[in-house]
Regions:
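Generic alpha-helical structural context detector
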Residues: 133-136, 150, 171
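Short, glycine/acidic-enriched loop or turn micro-motifs at the edges of active sites
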Residues: 19-21, 133, 168
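Short alpha-helix plus adjacent loop in nuclease-associated cores
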Residues: 127-143
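Acidic, divalent-metal-coordinating active-site segment for phosphoryl/phosphodiester hydrolysis
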Residues: 161-171
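Conserved non-catalytic scaffold segment of RNase H-like nuclease domains
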Residues: 1-125, 143-156, 160
Length: 171
């Protein structure tokens, strides 16, 4: 399957976000995980798990869902411009394909995140693939990532942590 993608695209980026809520205009990305596959379908050295300080209180429901703690974000979170630069750099190439499970959610957050920082131009050359749309064509409801992981017998964890969800989506 990957071979056919690289007939059209020069790289594939798989990403996932964890956020402070569900509104991409007012909530923030708190964790951005992504990896890049080269033309051979091999992971490059550009696997990232970036934690971002939201600059405000983290809703307790988000900590319950993800296990991400506010203190960990404030202590270890990177500046937003550093995170944006790392992601835009991963889009290097003429025709990148950005993939995500439930891509509409992640890409909406990513667009607003990059737009606020004046970096959204990097997305213009990318094309997008929603892995959930493929799963929906093949399996009955429900269509959460955990259902896809279970249905396909993928080893790994869907933990509402960006890096775990990226690896699950890749499989």
């Amino acid at each position: 399957m990957l071979e056919s993608l690289f007939q059209t695209y020069d790289s594939v980026i798989v990403l996932d976000t964890e956020t402070t809520g569900v509104n991409c205009k007012s909530d923030e990305i708190i964790e951005l995980g992504f990896l890049r596959l080269d033309r051979a379908g091999e992971r490059t050295e550009e696997d990232y798990l970036i934690r971002l300080s939201p600059g405000r209180r983290l809703p307790p429901v988000i900590t319950q869902l993800t296990g991400i703690r506010e203190d960990e974000l404030f202590q270890n979170g990177v500046e937003k411009d550093v995170a944006a630069e790392a992601f835009v750099r991963s889009l290097a190439g003429e025709k990148p394909l950005v993939c995500a499970y439930n891509a509409q959610f992640d890409l909406c957050f990513l667009f607003y995140f990059l737009h606020r920082l004046g970096c959204d131009g990097g997305l213009q050359k990318a094309q997008f693939l929603d892995i959930m749309a493929i799963y929906k064509d093949r399996r009955d409801y429900p269509h959460k990532l955990c259902n896809a992981v279970e249905s396909y017998g993928v080893d790994g964890v869907n933990s509402h942590r960006a890096v775990d969800d990226v690896n699950a989506a890749l499989e």
